[in-house]
A protein has these predicted regions:
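Bacterial Sec-dependent N-terminal signal peptides
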Residues: 1-25, 615, 739
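Patatin-like phospholipase
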Residues: 19-61, 69-371, 375-388, 392-394, ...
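Outer-membrane beta-barrel and related beta-rich outer-membrane complex signature
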Residues: 242, 478-480, 520-526, 573-577, ...
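Gram-negative/organellar outer-membrane beta-barrel architecture
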Residues: 364, 369, 375, 381-553, ...
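C-terminal outer-membrane beta-barrel translocator/porin domains of Gram-negative envelope proteins
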Residues: 407, 540-545, 549-670
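Short glycine-rich beta-strand segments
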Residues: 471-475, 515-519, 564-572, 618-622, ...
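Flexible, solvent-exposed loop segments that connect beta-strands
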Residues: 480-486, 524-530, 577-585, 643-647, ...
């Protein structure tokens, strides 16, 4: 209960008279769990620091455990607050892998499907023990506590510490005070059905808040004479707040903890209850407000902390000095162990990480190595423990959880151009050959697409790959004259390719390749200009790609480049070209060089506003134009053969052998997951004919205004667009992610 300051002074005087001079009353600090609300505890730490009050023992649960452990390991309240404000909580509390961590071979496939279901023992697995595995959270916690890697007994921390977890099998309390501190903290905050359970000491552990959310008994057992307890929860919900089955289950889950709280509360000497009723455990979007409430409460208790500190200090005994964290600390790793591998080998894992023994590593370097391995998508979770061998060296133990070898993925996609389609993908690793990825994808619906690919990793660190694949696209396309629909035809496009690629890190990849294409045309609505039949060609090319985007969907920062320089030859045809129903001479089929470029850049401006720009260019270096090889202009999204996107015109409205386009855009958040996107673009076509020294070309300009919303199964975009040349206001609807 909240004792008066006078009583605390009496207690201090008692210790002054009854103990030797070397004794002083021990101060215990207990922090409750509470998810995002638990960050308000930081305000109490700041007030304690300002008052000069020295804490001797700390206990905590869930988020209270994390805040308490940071303080126990040597961070100040101010330092903890600064770190919390810089954290990307959306990334930490999700299963998303940072796009920058993915290998270049995996980036284009990441987040293309709404659902990814593992296939284990030939069965599709739907659910795990928790939705979020928390790999990024694990990495962040490990980094923050790297400076105390050599401490495996939490009593040896600068301030002795314990945290609470629950045994998932028995429902009993588990007090964690030894071992890997990152694992202990992750266990303490593993909210059932939200975070996956943590394997530790032959147990499956979940959030300690189920049985003891306010562990005052434990800090008393550690030796605390005076206990400061900070609680951010409000206990069981009133009956009028229980409105659905989920509320019922949550209420029942905390019955046991509610009874325990009644025993914990009387053991506090200074009880602090935070006024955070308007927030909940998931209010990480309101961190600044929660921190402000914590600071306000801390300031209100500062006078009490100050008087208590002065009373204790008057006893003439100073507590031991706490060393500050050594932020740039490195450790010399002489031994490496890996546990948990069944589908892949230890050499393969270490090569992916580019990790060697007998080298110095910082926390950031180890985190980068872990992300590099996880970026291959062979692994779903990687944690590590450092065990000191000598004063200057350590053994590192990687605890690895592998992804299942195979996944079934699915999504839906709609545009007026493609119609509505179901996208289905089966991806399997090491199916035929070790160190490989095989993939088969289908888009089934109003249009038909297919892709099959085999990727074979080569080289010690798997930065070289051989890629073989085939694509098919069956699509109805409108033909245009003067920006008006004139007819339609069905295009069947087949492509086989072989690439030899080298990736320099996770941002850049280049290589050489060859492809063979076959295109078949069949008019479905007759038009002024018609093509019927098929032709094929071979292309040999060099390519260079770069991708530093921070996320796949609606990126905020980064650069993406796709460049290709190729030579088209061995064109074979069986075509008939008609003009107003009269057959005309065949198109030109001479060999030619082809250059294409697509670059996008995203720059954060302010308050979530993102400026973006895209440059596209394509040139066929030939003086005899062949419309079948031209670039097809139009469409805001999507991808089909030779497309150059242009806001203002539908897909394939215009074609040209030489195109250069610039788009500028602004994306403005309006509510959570919703944006207004404005685009303006200009395009120059037909600027190079190569049978004259110059060509003025033709300019196109267009605009689009889009409302975009991120749904759980993909983006929904509703656009109005206009072109100065087409002179028509048109709608453009997209739902889902293109195939």
């Amino acid at each position: 209960m909240k004792f008066s300051f006078g009583l605390l002074c009496v207690m201090c005087c008692f210790y002054a008279s009854a103990q030797e001079k070397s004794a002083r009353p021990k101060i215990g600090l207990t922090f409750s769990g509470g998810g995002a609300k638990g960050l308000a505890h930081i305000g109490i730490l700041k007030a304690i620091d300002s008052a000069g009050l020295k804490v001797d023992y700390i206990t905590g649960t869930s988020m209270g455990a994390i805040v308490g452990a940071l303080y126990a390991s040597g961070y100040s309240g101010n330092e903890i607050e600064k770190m919390v404000k810089l954290m990307d909580w959306d990334a930490l509390l999700s299963n998303n892998i940072p796009l920058q961590s993915l290998s270049m071979e995996e980036k284009e496939q990441y987040k293309r499907y709404a659902v990814e279901l593992p296939i284990i023992n030939k069965k599709i697995r739907l659910l795990q023990t928790g939705y979020i595995q928390g790999q990024e959270l694990n990495s962040e916690i490990s980094k923050l506590f790297f400076h105390v890697y050599n401490i495996h007994n939490f009593n040896d921390l600068p301030i002795p510490f314990k945290c609470m977890a629950t045994d998932l099998e028995t429902g009993k309390l588990v007090v964690l005070d030894t071992g890997n501190i990152a694992s202990a903290l992750r266990s303490s905050m593993a909210i059932p059905s939200v975070f996956s359970a943590v394997s530790r000491d032959n147990k499956k552990l979940v959030d300690g808040g189920l049985v003891r959310n306010f562990p005052v008994k434990n800090v008393k057992q550690m030796g605390a004479d005076i206990v400061i307890g900070s609680n951010v929860t409000n206990g069981l919900s009133k009956i009028d707040k229980i409105k659905n089955p989920v509320d019922v289950l949550m209420q029942m889950a905390f019955f046991k903890e509610s009874e325990d709280f009644k025993e914990e509360l009387p053991l506090t000497d200074i009880y602090i209850h935070m006024p955070l009723e308007k927030y909940n455990t998931a209010s990480f979007g309101s961190i600044d407000h929660i921190l402000a409430e914590g600071n306000k409460t801390g300031r209100s208790y500062y006078p009490q902390f100050k008087r208590l500190a002065d009373s204790i200090n008057s006893l003439g005994v100073s507590p031991a000095k706490i060393d500050k964290p050594f932020y740039n600390k490195s450790v010399f790793v002489t031994e490496v162990e890996v546990t948990g591998l069944h589908l892949t080998s230890i050499p393969f894992f270490l090569h992916l990480m580019n990790f060697d023994d007998h080298r110095y590593y910082t926390a950031i370097q180890i985190s980068k190595s872990v992300r590099r391995a996880q970026g291959s998508r062979y692994y779903s979770g990687i944690t590590y423990t450092l065990e000191p061998l000598t004063k200057d060296s350590a053994r590192i133990i990687f605890n690895v959880e592998e992804n299942p070898a195979s996944f079934l993925k699915a999504g839906i996609y709609y545009t007026k151009f493609r119609g509505i389609n179901a996208n289905i993908n089966l991806t399997s690793r090491d199916f035929f050959i070790n160190n490989s990825r095989d993939m088969v994808s289908f888009s089934l619906g109003e249009s038909m697409q297919m892709e099959a690919e085999h990727l074979q990793y080569l080289g010690r660190i798997k930065n070289v790959a051989f890629i073989a694949g085939a694509k098919m696209d069956n699509q109805d396309i409108s033909s245009y004259v003067d920006y008006r629909i004139d007819g339609a035809y069905r295009q069947k496009f087949y492509r086989g390719y072989l690439n030899f690629q080298n990736s320099g890190g996770n941002r850049i990849a280049g290589g050489i390749g060859a492809s063979i294409e076959n295109i078949r045309y069949h008019p479905t609505i007759h038009s002024m200009t018609e093509v019927q039949g098929n032709f094929s060609a071979i292309k040999t090319y060099l390519y260079l790609n770069y991708n530093s985007l921070n996320q796949a969907l609606y990126p905020v920062r980064g650069l993406k480049l796709i460049t290709e320089l190729g030579y088209v030859y061995n064109q074979k045809h069986n075509l008939q070209l008609f003009q107003n129903g009269v057959q005309v001479a065949d198109p030109n089929y001479d060999n030619f060089t082809r250059l294409s470029f697509d670059g996008s850049v995203f720059i954060p401006i302010h308050s979530g506003i993102t400026l973006f720009s895209e440059i596209q260019a394509g040139v066929n270096f030939t003086d005899k134009s062949n419309v079948l090889n031209n670039f097809q202009i139009g469409g805001i999204n999507g991808n089909f053969r030779n497309q150059v996107r242009f806001a203002g015109l539908p897909e394939a409205s215009v074609n040209s052998p030489a195109v250069a386009a610039l788009q500028l855009g602004l994306r403005i958040p309006v509510i959570s997951n919703a944006y207004i996107i404005a685009r303006v673009n200009a395009l120059l076509k037909d600027f190079a004919t190569f049978n004259t020294t110059t060509s003025p070309g033709t300019w196109l300009t267009g605009y689009a205004l889009t409302f975009a919303y991120k749904t759980p199964i993909g983006p929904l975009e509703l656009s109005a667009m206009y072109s100065d040349q087409g002179k028509r206001l048109q709608s453009y609807v997209l739902f889902g992610i293109p195939f």
